[in-house]
Amino acid sequence: MLKRTPLFDLYKEYGGKTIDFGGWELPVQFSSIKEEHEAVRTKAGLFDVSHMGEVEITGTDSLPFLQKLLTNDVSTLKEGGAQYTAMCYEDGGTIDDLLVYKKAANVYMLVINAANIDKDVDWMNKHIKGDVSVRNVSDEIALLALQGPKAEAILKQVADHDLAELKPFMFRDDAAVGSVQALVSRTGYTGEDGFEIYCRNEDAACIWKLLLETGKDSGLVPCGLGARDTLRFEAKLPLYGQELSKDITPIEAGIGFAVKTNKASDFIGKAVLASQKEHGADRKLVGLEMIDKGIPRHGYAVYYQGEQAGEVTTGTQSPTLKKNVGLALLKKEACALDTVVEVEIRNKRLKAKIVKTPFYKRQP
């Protein structure tokens, strides 16, 4: 049986159409992917992302433990700060990409991808040294994402703190949304400004309804996984299983900024990632824009000078650009801007060119 989030019973009320997403029954859309995408880019959207995993790390050795496992430098995090990072195998392949929240000295929360929860927790448990506790709290926590240029104004009306003061990648874990206690962080996965709200399962419906009611006049709409994917894709935010995997390193995927090879602590995968950072990886994640008519899709082969150079990781018709575009992991010789390549679509090789990414960048 598919897993369900605490908000499942509300989906129908708002017109949600559900799909099987990695063993979860989640809404792919409420109105339409295009409308929801547009709302987040211009007004605001609300997502149920309660399927994401949360892991609590505590103990006096929690910092050295995280420094060993994660590619970013956790020692730079202050209380109330969040950091994007990756967890890698010794060969540099990616176990997961995740967020680390520092709640207090020796108290951290990791937010991990739903499909990777068991694998990630097993990996962490295998590497425990000293005074470290790893607790999977995924089933106790719901997560809502309020995203878009009007997100701040909407949240301001119902939150007890002035959350406008939160800078990106900062959070408050003593916030109240309506009458509900929550952790609110200025983070997201859309390329827009926004907030992620962590609360107890039993409080999720209350926050969901309150936000949608409060934001109605500002154009806030409920959004599904379809728009979440097109939004993150335009902003070139990687999705595990597509742009990142056990066979793709963070450097290849273009998130080298989250790999600190100069941090004082050694970490798993460092040798390979340091070499790729210094000398360049053999493959690179690049943007494609179709010249011929066709939409590049995940897994489609890409050819350069008659030979396969890699494949598409994600592709669609961009709702913002109104163009058929894709991300592709290609051999470095095929990656120069304006290089013409061919994408195999329905047994035909169609022309595309390498373009700049991200496809969309929010204007401050």
Swiss-Prot record:
Q: What is its EC number?
A: 2.1.2.10
Keyword Transferase recorded: yes
Identify the stretch annotated as signal peptide in this record.
none
Q: Which PANTHER family match?
A: AMINOMETHYLTRANSFERASE (PTHR43757), AMINOMETHYLTRANSFERASE, MITOCHONDRIAL (PTHR43757:SF2)
Which family, according to UniProt? Belongs to the GcvT family.
Q: How does it assemble?
A: The glycine cleavage system is composed of four proteins: P, T, L and H.
Q: What is this protein called?
A: Aminomethyltransferase
Upper classification of the organism: Bacteria, Bacillati, Bacillota, Bacilli, Bacillales
Which gene underlies this protein? gcvT
